[in-house]
Amino acid sequence: MPELPEVETTLRGIAPHVTGRRVTAVTARAAKLRLPIPPELGERLTGRVIERVERRAKYLLLRCGDGTAIIHLGMTGTLRVAPAGSPPGKYDHLDLVLDDGRTLRFRDPRKFGLVLWTGSDPLAHPLLAQLGPEPFPPLFNGSYLFSRSRKRNAAIKLLLMDNRIVVGVGNIYANEALFRARIHPERAAGSLSEEDCATLATAVGDVLRDAIAEGDTTLHEFIATEVPSGYFRINPAVYGQTGKPCTVCGTPIARIRLGNRSTWFCPVCQK
């Protein structure tokens, strides 16, 4: 599933090619993804200029004057700018043809993504309104995490993955951030000190920024005719490293199930 760094890189990859471009035609080849594609989408978008592209959590927002297309990539979705005349593939469900002849193309083999339209503030849309802050300062920091974790017995890893607390911290990045902060994933969130929270908030931001920086090396792929694999080459310290030696102390990395998700940690370094 594309996580926040992949979505941010998608934004950076397509924005230079679509910003300021007018949509001249819309072709929807599927009536429904995770939710139905609005039947009026073509009418709403055709003739409008994409003024800017934004990201909120894992949603991409195509701002078009007084309306916005809201896009979520789901589990397997990608957005690419296809050359003029490039034929669609089997899983290419939506095309926005631009005034330079190229096409902003949404591909989604498993059809768990979504494309919606709103004529009001997209941040007030029910899908976005209850989301927590982005996982970076100034809104997400140690003080914020400390205040939101008080009197909570939930495991800190589960708190990090709660989009109402903070957005964009998927399983990979939660595991890696907790390792960097030396905090056990099962530890009760309410037991963290202010110093713990400050360290963890910094680790979350650092892990995600590192992944985004890796993604910046793939920006050329967003105008390729072939769809790349889409996931960045990361070198995780704990994620997926069951039994391998900890990079700090050499202890074998342990794996448990937490909240129905695989969780990895160092039994010695993380307390």
Swiss-Prot record:
Function: Involved in base excision repair of DNA damaged by oxidation or by mutagenic agents. Acts as a DNA glycosylase that recognizes and removes damaged bases. Has a preference for oxidized purines, such as 7,8-dihydro-8-oxoguanine (8-oxoG). Has AP (apurinic/apyrimidinic) lyase activity and introduces nicks in the DNA strand. Cleaves the DNA backbone by beta-delta elimination to generate a single-strand break at the site of the removed base with both 3'- and 5'-phosphates.
Subunit structure: Monomer.
Record's catalysed reaction(s): Hydrolysis of DNA containing ring-opened 7-methylguanine residues, releasing 2,6-diamino-4-hydroxy-5-(N-methyl)formamidopyrimidine; 2'-deoxyribonucleotide-(2'-deoxyribose 5'-phosphate)-2'-deoxyribonucleotide-DNA = a 3'-end 2'-deoxyribonucleotide-(2,3-dehydro-2,3-deoxyribose 5'-phosphate)-DNA + a 5'-end 5'-phospho-2'-deoxyribonucleoside-DNA + H(+)
Zinc finger regions, FPG-type: 237-271
Protein name: Formamidopyrimidine-DNA glycosylase
Molecular function in Gene Ontology: 8-oxo-7,8-dihydroguanine DNA N-glycosylase activity; class I DNA-(apurinic or apyrimidinic site) endonuclease activity; damaged DNA binding; DNA-(apurinic or apyrimidinic site) endonuclease activity; zinc ion binding
Residues that bind DNA: 110, 152
EC numbers: 3.2.2.23, 4.2.99.18
Protein's GO biological process: base-excision repair
GN (gene name): mutM
Residues at the active site: 2 (schiff-base intermediate with dna), 3 (proton donor), 58 (proton donor), 261 (proton donor)
Keyword annotations: DNA damage, DNA repair, DNA-binding, Glycosidase, Hydrolase, Lyase, Metal-binding, Multifunctional enzyme, Zinc, Zinc-finger
Entry's family note: Belongs to the FPG family.
